[in-house]
Swiss-Prot record:
The keyword Transit peptide does not apply. One of its GO terms (cellular component) is cytosolic large ribosomal subunit. This is Large ribosomal subunit protein bL19. Keywords: Ribonucleoprotein, Ribosomal protein. This protein is located at the 30S-50S ribosomal subunit interface and may play a role in the structure and function of the aminoacyl-tRNA binding site. It comes from Mycobacteroides abscessus (strain ATCC 19977 / DSM 44196 / CCUG 20993 / CIP 104536 / JCM 13569 / NCTC 13031 / TMC 1543 / L948). Belongs to the bacterial ribosomal protein bL19 family. Pfam families: Ribosomal_L19. InterPro entries: Ribosomal_bL19, Ribosomal_bL19_CS, Ribosomal_bL19_sf, Translation_prot_SH3-like_sf.
Length: 113
């Protein structure tokens, strides 16, 4: 095993659920404000997953007061407390960038049965 692979293996998280683009998830993020630490929940639809290993990332999109907000998280980040899957989406694409232009009911994703 390569030394770099050994270091990467140590920083991988085991508690990451199996989620895909189209799923609606809650990402519980640790936020540090001054000396206090709290957990902030970011709820949205997974637009994409990219990369592999330690450098894997995913992007979540939500609408907040009529404005679209996208946030990209590293999958194995220590700043993520945990991820919970709310609904599974039935989509046929790996990257859901087309959701950026859609509004209202058209932006809804069918739930996988």
């Amino acid at each position: 095993m390569n030394t770099l692979d050994f270091v990467d293996q140590a920083s991988l998280r085991e508690d990451v659920p199996d989620f895909r683009p189209g799923d609606t998830i809650n990402v519980h993020v640790k936020v540090i404000e001054g000396s206090k630490e709290r957990i902030q929940v970011f709820k949205g639809v997974v637009l994409r997953r990219s990369g592999g290993g330690v450098s894997a990332t995913f992007t979540v999109r939500k609408e907040s007061y009529g404005v679209g907000v996208e946030r990209t998280f590293p999958v194995h980040s220590p700043n993520i407390d945990h991820i919970e899957i709310l609904t599974r989406g039935a989509v046929r694409r790996a990257k859901l960038y087309y959701l950026r232009e859609l509004r209202g009911k058209k932006a809804k994703i069918k739930e996988k049965r």
